[in-house]
Regions:
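Short, basic/aromatic-enriched C-terminal tail that caps enzymatic domains
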Residues: 1-4, 239-253
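Ferredoxin-reductase
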Residues: 2-84
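Structural signal for conserved beta-strand scaffold positions within catalytic alpha/beta enzyme cores
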Residues: 12, 57, 157-159, 211, ...
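FNR/FR-type flavoprotein reductase catalytic core
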Residues: 76-214
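Local cysteine-cluster metal-coordination motifs and their immediate loop/turn environment
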Residues: 118, 192, 215-247
Length: 253
């Protein structure tokens, strides 16, 4: 796993929704090797423990990396206070990303809440072959829909309260699309119960599926056991590091 650590200039910052921020980081040496599904480990000012944040976009031409995150604790709140022109301490790119297969003709991307940003690089790669299903609590939490449409993807929006889009779980339109039998692959990121159900649906439909796990992390490089999780391969249980072996896993694992 090749990665680098340094302080990089913030090229842009904006609020996308309540407590959700987007930051563009100038880091050409990282964008050259980063791939969809990987993450960055950011050190908030005044803290000693880094925070893992998924990569939302990789612009090799401009040499900028985009992250989108929600402010849940003190660490992410400090990151959100950083402004354009300031430096951000980052270890990146980390983890095992998504499998890209250009033979796929129809791709379904499923994002739940803050699990939606990692889907954007895939939408940009697969373009018009992509249908993006996004799920949020309410209309005020919706993000990145214009970005997905700009990438050429078809979008299906779901909310828990029905304040915009469909009032349903993301698994409902997913099952409908698979019933039509026109999907070659599913990529998903979001809460564990959502990923578990998507994995079951994919296996029952015989469709290739990869999921990106959201997990607490310590070192980010596989040296500690904070993010260890059970996986299954060839009928046997194994332990894997989400930060190193993941965060992307085949759904059958």
């Amino acid at each position: 796993m090749k990665y680098t650590q340094g302080k990089y200039q913030i090229a842009g910052k904006r609020a996308l929704a309540k407590d959700i921020f987007s930051i563009d980081i100038k880091c050409p040496e990282i964008t050259e090797i980063a791939c969809p599904g990987q993450f960055v480990h950011i050190l908030p000012p005044g803290f000693t423990l880094r925070r893992p944040i998924s990569i939302c976009d990789i612009d090799k031409k401009s040499g900028t990396l985009r992250i989108v995150f929600i402010t849940k604790g003190d660490g992410t709140k400090e990151i959100a206070k950083l402004n354009e022109g300031e430096l951000i301490d980052m270890l990146a790119p980390l983890g095992h990303g998504f499998t890209i297969d250009n033979s796929f003709k129809k791709i379904i991307l499923v994002g739940g809440g803050i699990g939606t940003p990692p889907m954007l690089p895939l939408a940009k790669i697969y373009g018009e072959r992509t249908t993006v299903i996004s799920g949020f609590r309410s209309a005020e939490a919706v993000i990145l829909q214009r970005d997905f449409k700009a990438a050429g993807a078809e979008t299906i929006l779901c909310t828990d309260d029905g304040s915009t889009g469909r009032k349903c779980l993301v698994t409902e339109p997913l099952a409908e699309l698979l019933k039509e039998g026109n999907a070659d692959a599913i990529y998903a990121c979001g809460p564990a119960p959502m990923l578990k159900r998507i994995s079951e649906i994919a296996e029952n439909s015989g469709v290739f599926c990869e999921v990106s796990l959201e997990e607490r992390m310590g070192c980010g490089i596989g040296a500690c056991l904070v993010c260890a999780c059970k996986t299954r391969k060839d009928g046997e249980e194994h332990f894997a590091h989400v930060c190193k072996n993941g965060p992307v896993f085949n759904s059958k694992e």
